[in-house]
Amino acid sequence: MDRPKEYDNLIKAGAFAEITPEQAAVQARIVRAQGYLDYAQYCADNPQFNLQRYMSLYDGFFELVQAVLEHYGVRQKDSGRKLAIQ
Protein backbone atom coordinates (compact mmCIF):
# COMPACT_ATOMS: atom_id res chain seq x y z
CA MET A 1 0.00 0.00 0.00
CA ASP A 2 1.27 3.43 -0.87
CA ARG A 3 1.78 5.66 2.12
CA PRO A 4 2.51 9.36 2.42
CA LYS A 5 6.11 10.22 1.59
CA GLU A 6 6.43 11.95 4.98
CA TYR A 7 6.15 8.57 6.69
CA ASP A 8 9.04 7.20 4.65
CA ASN A 9 11.11 10.24 5.56
CA LEU A 10 10.34 9.70 9.26
CA ILE A 11 11.38 6.05 8.95
CA LYS A 12 14.70 7.15 7.41
CA ALA A 13 15.14 9.69 10.22
CA GLY A 14 14.56 6.96 12.82
CA ALA A 15 11.41 8.52 14.30
CA PHE A 16 9.08 5.83 12.93
CA ALA A 17 9.54 2.10 12.38
CA GLU A 18 8.16 0.13 9.47
CA ILE A 19 5.77 -2.64 10.48
CA THR A 20 3.46 -5.13 8.84
CA PRO A 21 -0.01 -3.61 9.22
CA GLU A 22 -2.62 -5.74 10.95
CA GLN A 23 -6.26 -4.99 10.25
CA ALA A 24 -7.24 -6.41 13.65
CA ALA A 25 -5.00 -3.86 15.37
CA VAL A 26 -6.54 -1.04 13.33
CA GLN A 27 -10.04 -2.18 14.28
CA ALA A 28 -9.10 -2.54 17.96
CA ARG A 29 -7.81 1.03 18.04
CA ILE A 30 -11.00 2.29 16.42
CA VAL A 31 -13.07 0.43 19.02
CA ARG A 32 -10.98 1.98 21.82
CA ALA A 33 -11.40 5.43 20.27
CA GLN A 34 -15.17 4.92 20.27
CA GLY A 35 -15.01 3.97 23.95
CA TYR A 36 -13.16 7.19 24.74
CA LEU A 37 -15.77 9.16 22.79
CA ASP A 38 -18.61 7.44 24.63
CA TYR A 39 -17.04 8.32 27.98
CA ALA A 40 -16.49 11.93 26.89
CA GLN A 41 -20.14 12.21 25.92
CA TYR A 42 -21.10 10.80 29.32
CA CYS A 43 -18.99 13.51 30.98
CA ALA A 44 -20.41 16.29 28.79
CA ASP A 45 -23.36 17.05 31.08
CA ASN A 46 -21.21 17.37 34.20
CA PRO A 47 -18.94 20.45 34.31
CA GLN A 48 -16.92 18.95 37.15
CA PHE A 49 -15.68 16.33 34.66
CA ASN A 50 -14.25 18.78 32.10
CA LEU A 51 -10.69 17.53 32.58
CA GLN A 52 -11.75 13.90 32.24
CA ARG A 53 -13.72 14.78 29.11
CA TYR A 54 -10.75 16.58 27.56
CA MET A 55 -8.35 13.74 28.37
CA SER A 56 -10.76 11.15 27.05
CA LEU A 57 -11.16 13.02 23.76
CA TYR A 58 -7.40 13.49 23.46
CA ASP A 59 -6.70 9.82 24.09
CA GLY A 60 -9.45 8.83 21.65
CA PHE A 61 -7.98 11.07 18.97
CA PHE A 62 -4.55 9.55 19.57
CA GLU A 63 -6.03 6.06 19.14
CA LEU A 64 -7.29 7.17 15.72
CA VAL A 65 -3.83 8.52 14.87
CA GLN A 66 -2.32 5.17 15.84
CA ALA A 67 -4.91 3.37 13.70
CA VAL A 68 -3.93 5.46 10.67
CA LEU A 69 -0.23 4.81 11.28
CA GLU A 70 -0.91 1.08 11.60
CA HIS A 71 -2.94 1.16 8.39
CA TYR A 72 0.04 2.64 6.54
CA GLY A 73 2.51 0.20 8.10
CA VAL A 74 4.38 2.53 10.43
CA ARG A 75 4.67 2.91 14.17
CA GLN A 76 6.21 5.70 16.18
CA LYS A 77 9.38 4.92 18.06
CA ASP A 78 10.46 7.23 20.87
CA SER A 79 9.34 10.32 18.96
CA GLY A 80 6.35 10.93 21.23
CA ARG A 81 2.74 11.73 20.55
CA LYS A 82 3.31 15.19 19.14
CA LEU A 83 5.19 13.96 16.07
CA ALA A 84 2.71 11.16 15.47
CA ILE A 85 -0.21 13.60 15.59
CA GLN A 86 1.44 16.11 13.26
Can you say where each PLM-predicted feature lies in the sequence?
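Terminal alpha-helical segments
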Residues: 1-86
